[in-house]
Structure formats: structure tokens, C-alpha cells
Amino acid sequence: MVRPFGEIGSHRKHVLEWYRYSLRNIRANVPTDNLQIELWNTLRQAVRRNRNHKAGWYVRGLLEDLSHLNKYIVGDDIIKLVALKNKYTEQIEPAPEPLQQANKPISGVVVTENMGDESRREKKKRLAPIPGDGDLYRYLLRYYKIYGPTKTIPRKHIDELLRPLAIHERYCKILYRIEYRIAKGPPKVSINYTNAGQSRIWFIRSPFNRKARQSKKLTGIIIKARLRAQDNLDRFRECESKLFYAFQEAQWEYTLIHKQPCSRKFNDVVTQIKSGKSNDIPAVFIDWIKPILEDMDILNRINANTQRKFTESRDHLIDGKQYEYYKQLNQRLYKKRLERFLGLKAELPTTNPFTEEKNLGALLVKWRFLRPDQLVKVKS
């Protein structure tokens, strides 16, 4: 009889680990306390509500949503995160009729507008007046956390006052990352390697030759070395497969000559011919197997020579001053970057988030820490 997947220990363990990871992820990476609390409570309620479900496809959908939750948190996609949360908050069943009657307001009692007893859904609509603008949404969450619930902010005030502050906050995060990288000191130069078969191709890695800046010559060397290594490996495997067929052919000829098969085993024959101790091996076996072993030795020597060549090139990287060249180049790059940062820092008191010419983004572009196409497009 097939057991329900909920009773399988590995399934339960996996789901529990994923659930705990999601809770930790919410605490660590969600930018605002309000959203943290809402996601935390929604996730716990959804797990409690669905822990006894037996339908496989339904549970699969829940696990996929859990995967999307962590993906949106890590990717800082607030809009999709809120949409996923709303999907589960809207699934909560309405209260029973007696409770609904009890929640109706008593006639004759006037409720003031600034009491702040708005529902989560109303608050969410008010907090996200502009879809697709994650920076502004996060800023509004913090704004309402500090100043409390108020009436809906006019669109004009959002565009002219709050949006520039939200964009300024984003540029501040970029500035903090730049300051952190500069505080770490000059970028490091290292000798890295990549595998090509059994060989290791060594090269200098620095900010000047990373990713798209990597030398085309080095890229060509790596590609050719890997193709040659794969070709040698294919030939070696072909020789290994031919060894057994050669042994069978030799066994057949031996049987035709002596009217009975040779009692020697395949591994014993190959081992003795390899070691050169083949005096007691019939000549017909040596004639068939030895040429293949010689081809395999040639391939092994080619592989060993390739490894030795790349090892020598690694030593040349240090002895030939190439390592020192990139190290000094990094020092000069860091010095120029530090000078630009100090110039940027001197102009920070003059920044104004509400002007296009003097905002922090324009300052980052001026001192070449951002490209013009990386600026946030201000909507109006």
C-alpha cells in the first residue's frame, strides 16, 4: 500500500527545514519591520492551515510558493513579495455570522478618522499607490512606521516630496557600498587556475582582467587545452575498450593453434606486458596487446608534458614580474579611486535630493562612481 507523502520522514524533514529557513530569511533580509511581521504571521498561519492536506498537487503549489517567497526576499522584489502575501491573506475564511454581527458598528457612535483602526488591506493599498516602484514602497513603509497611520498622501506630495527622498536613500546605499569597498583597501591580485583535463591552467586574476576583460589569448589557450584534453581522454578510453577485444582476438588465434584456450586471465596478461615481464606470455597476446599499450603510454606522456608546461607557466607568472605588474596597477587604481571618493565626500554637504543637478546621483556620476544610464528615472 502506498504511504501518504506526509508520513515519509524525508519529506517532513525537508519541509520543516525549508520552513525554518524561510522564517530566518524573513527576519534577516526583509527591509522593514511591518512587512517582516506580516510575512512572518502569514507564513505561520498558512503552514498551520495546510499542514494536514493530502492532495499532492496542492502541496506542490504551496512548496513552489514557498520557493518564490525566498526568491523574492533575496532578490528584494517587494511588489511580488506583497502580491504573494496578499494571495494568502485573501484566502482566510470570513468570520462566522455571530462574529460578523458583533463587529458591526453601534448606531449613533461617531468614529473619528485619525483613530488609526484601518485594516491591513486598506493600509496596503495606501502604502503602495504606485505599482512597480519598490524604492518608494519601502520608503513609505518606514514613513508610516515612524509617523503612524494618517490620511492618504496626495499623489502630488508623493511625486514631489517622498519620491526624491526614496531615490536619495537608494543612492545612499550605493555610497555606503563604495565606502565599504574603499575601506577594505586595494583589490587583491591572486594566481588562479582552471582545469583542462588533468592539467591546471594558471593565470593572474585582478580587477583588470576579470570576466569580460579577460584576455582573449588566455581564453583561446583555455579552450584549446580543454579540447586537446578531451581528445586525449577519448582516445585513451578507446584504447582501453580495444584492449579487451585484442585479448579476445589473441585468445582466438591461440585456440586455433593449440586447440585449446589459454588459461591466463585478461588482467594478468595486460599487467605483465605493461611491466615488461612477459617472458611466459604467449607471443600472440604480446603482438595484439603491446601496440595498444604503447599508444596509451604516448597519450600519458602527452598529458604529463602538458601538466609540466602549465606548471612552468605558473612559476613564470611570479618570476617574470607579471604578478608584481598587476599588483602595482591595482595600487594605482585604488589611489585614483580614493582621490575621487575624497572629492565626492567633500561635495556631499552641497547635495539636495530635490534637484536634478545637485542630487546624490548626479554627484556619483560626476565622480565616475555611476554611469548616466544607471541613474534612477524620476517619474512625474
UniProtKB/Swiss-Prot annotation:
Species this chain originates from: Kluyveromyces lactis (strain ATCC 8585 / CBS 2359 / DSM 70799 / NBRC 1267 / NRRL Y-1140 / WM37)
Function: Essential for respiratory growth and required for mitochondrial protein synthesis. Required for vacuolar acidification.
Keywords in alphabetical order: Mitochondrion
Family: Belongs to the RRG1 family.
Name this polypeptide is given: Required for respiratory growth protein 1, mitochondrial
Subcellular location, record wording: Mitochondrion
Annotated GO CC locations: mitochondrion
Lineage of the organism: Eukaryota, Fungi, Dikarya, Ascomycota, Saccharomycotina
